[in-house]
């Protein structure tokens, strides 16, 4: 189990829908009875209440609201089960071989499973292709409903770790206390995934240690390309006689 870290995939599909022009941040997201009945962390959405997609994203990223995550899943997918099918399909595309999603918010459910490696894969996809997520997950406090609802970020590393850029925390009885933490310093970007901690203090300490190790032991560097490096390679029995090479 990975608790609310699940919401990274929910967010990834949402931002992909935004990029494709299928939805916009100003769209109104309706609240169903199903979303209303979500337990755990929430912003106490009422059936029929209408918030913009932008507001729902704030609730998900800052306060880890389960009701908002399910409302968005229903808005994007038509229903939560259909959206979860898309989550699993996307996980397969990304090579997340040990992941199965059963819901869009991360509440404990039989068969809802993943690994630290798979969480890192989807976190990387989110951060690389949709860096605008940082505009949401690095906000410490915000409000909704004209100031009536206060949002406080569940990621305490925002207040204590230099270069932190996100990403998502999670806590349930079966999953324990979890985090997928991301940070950037001097063009080096790292992701640290901690699952199954016994407390928030342990979770943040473990993530801090992992990130500290990464920044101490690695650096970003450009590899020089030799002037005589081949530009193409010959292809035998292929549709094209040569294959162009590029350095990335």
Which stretches of residues belong to each language-model region?
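Active-site-adjacent loops and short helices of periplasmic peptidoglycan-processing enzymes
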Residues: 1-120, 124-129
């Amino acid at each position: 189990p990975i608790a609310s870290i699940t919401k990274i995939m929910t967010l990834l599909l949402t931002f992909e829908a935004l990029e494709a022009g299928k939805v916009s941040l100003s769209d109104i997201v309706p609240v169903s009875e199903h979303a209303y009945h979500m337990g755990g962390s929430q912003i106490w959405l009422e059936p029929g209440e209408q918030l913009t997609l932008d507001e729902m994203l704030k609730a998900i990223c800052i306060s880890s609201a389960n009701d908002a995550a399910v409302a968005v899943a229903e808005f994007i997918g038509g229903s939560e089960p259909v959206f979860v099918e898309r989550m699993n399909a996307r996980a397969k595309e990304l090579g997340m071989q040990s992941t199965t999603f059963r819901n869009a918010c991360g509440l404990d459910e039989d068969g809802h499973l993943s690994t630290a490696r798979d969480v890192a894969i989807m976190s990387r996809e989110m951060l690389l292709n949709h860096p605008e997520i940082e505009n949401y997950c690095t906000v410490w406090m915000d409000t909704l409903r004209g100031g009536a609802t206060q949002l406080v970020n569940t990621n305490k590393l925002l207040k204590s770790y230099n270069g932190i850029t996100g990403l998502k925390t999670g806590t349930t009885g079966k999953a324990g206390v979890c985090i997928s933490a991301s940070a950037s310093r001097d063009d080096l970007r790292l992701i640290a995934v901690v699952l199954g901690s016994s407390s928030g203090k342990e979770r943040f300490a473990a993530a801090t240690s992992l990130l500290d190790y990464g920044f101490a032991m690695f650096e970003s560097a450009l590899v020089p390309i030799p002037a005589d490096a081949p530009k193409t390679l010959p292809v035998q029995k292929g549709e094209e006689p040569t294959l162009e090479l590029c350095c990335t």
